[in-house]
């Protein structure tokens, strides 16, 4: 079945196909993720809008049994500030790849599309891209079938405690129940507290967010542990972020 639709869409990536053609993966608001064929991409009027992290309203010809086609576009947003900063772009690429990994092709998920779009808009507006990524990661865990409770102790259900996390129980422990898991994570209590807050944050009302570098580093390390334990995906974009830690500081110092 072939149908024509108009939908908001975010380009996830493109890849070469034959000599001058491209296959373009777009996450659309109306019909989920689809692969689109662009013939003679280098000379095509579509060339400016088939680059990664371009958001536009596309006129699309959808083929449920094969490749789909882009017929036209308007209302283009290119996120210039994201694309001008290697570090922000790396994190933006990662959250887009994470959304891609969490959703099957051809499966509509308008709330996820809106969440990803808003995340990129807040990065573009200058909010802390590392913290935005942490919030995106913790909220998208449910798309992978993972539900974690950072609000209460798994044993006594008390709230507002100096919690630690236990992979043994997949939940938090209060100080009175630390002994239940000798291999508990020994987290800074601020980490479970922040993740509990992050699970409830609504990006539509978020105006500012700021955390100290040390806390952000601890969050990053624990999020990596959570994803390794419960999700088990290894995205190239995440590996690139990890590599930035090795040489990224040198680039920042050169800009001073």
Swiss-Prot record:
The keyword DNA damage applies. GO terms for biological process: DNA recombination; double-strand break repair. Keywords: DNA damage, DNA recombination, DNA repair. GO terms for cellular component: bacterial nucleoid. It holds the Pfam family RecO_C. Involved in DNA repair and RecF pathway recombination. NCBIfam families: reco. Belongs to the RecO family. This is DNA repair protein RecO. It comes from Streptococcus pneumoniae serotype 4 (strain ATCC BAA-334 / TIGR4).
């Amino acid at each position: 079945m072939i149908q024509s639709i108009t939908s908001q869409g975010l380009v996830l990536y493109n890849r070469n196909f034959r000599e001058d053609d491209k296959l373009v993966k777009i996450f659309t608001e109306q019909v989920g993720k689809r692969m689109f064929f662009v013939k003679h991409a280098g000379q095509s009027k579509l060339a400016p809008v088939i680059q990664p992290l371009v958001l536009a309203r596309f006129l699309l010809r959808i083929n449920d049994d094969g490749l789909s086609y882009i017929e036209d576009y308007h209302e283009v947003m290119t996120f210039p500030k994201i694309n001008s900063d290697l570090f922000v772009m790396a994190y933006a690429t990662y959250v887009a790849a994470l959304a891609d990994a969490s959703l099957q092709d051809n499966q509509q998920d308008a709330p996820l599309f809106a969440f990803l779009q808003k995340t990129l808009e807040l990065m573009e507006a200058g909010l802390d891209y590392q913290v935005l990524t942490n919030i995106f990661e913790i909220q998208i865990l449910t798309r992978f079938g993972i539900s974690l409770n950072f609000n209460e102790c798994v044993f006594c259900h008390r709230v507002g405690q100096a919690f630690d996390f236990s992979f043994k129980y997949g939940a938090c422990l209060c100080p009175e129940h630390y002994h239940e898991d000798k291999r508990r994570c020994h987290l800074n209590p601020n980490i479970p507290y922040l993740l509990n807050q992050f699970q409830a944050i609504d990006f539509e009302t978020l105006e500012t967010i700021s955390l100290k570098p040390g806390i952000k580093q601890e969050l990053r390390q624990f999020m990596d542990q959570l994803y390794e334990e419960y999700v088990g995906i290894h995205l190239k974009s995440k590996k690139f972020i990890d590599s930035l830690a090795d040489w990224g500081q040198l680039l920042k110092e050169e800009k001073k």
